[in-house]
Amino acid sequence: MIGSLCKNEAATKDVLRSVKAMGYDEIELNGFMTHPTSFFVRMLTKLAGMPTGKAGKYDWKKLVRDAGLGVTSIHFDLGTLERDLTACIQEAKDYPTSRIVVTGMYRFDYSDLKALEELSARLNKVGEQLAQSGIELLYHNHNVEFKRVGEKNQFAYEILMERLNPDWVNFEFDSYWAAE
């Protein structure tokens, strides 16, 4: 994750130029990197192995543009999308990208079938609204979606695949977390 290398703005510029020099044309941005976060959130992400430092204070649109990179997608948490969808759509278009990613949520109970059904409904609703604005919603897994659920003993990920409408929500499969 490049965020761990972005110790300060100068280092971030160097990292982005190096990414471009390696032949990449686009990067994916995470909301922890692109928005100021509280000390508590920075500590949690650091403990999870995803340190972000003070990257939320940088002008990422300018940094990415100056490095000659594009943005393939940007992450938002589901709560932010539900609370302020218009601002999220505008931010995606400002980068510009046509993809928004929601990640698996650690405070969510993936072993509860009813909760998974409710999560699917929420994701479908946001995905439908984003689709109307020309933006695709992607669901990015972590290891928590690989808990067994219900009488069929399915993975939570399988239940999400069954319940999410592919016209509104697609998947960004992270094999690292699936193998963990």
Segments from the language model and where they lie:
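Active-site beta-loop-alpha junctions enriched in small/polar residues
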Residues: 1-5, 30-34, 76-79, 105-107, ...
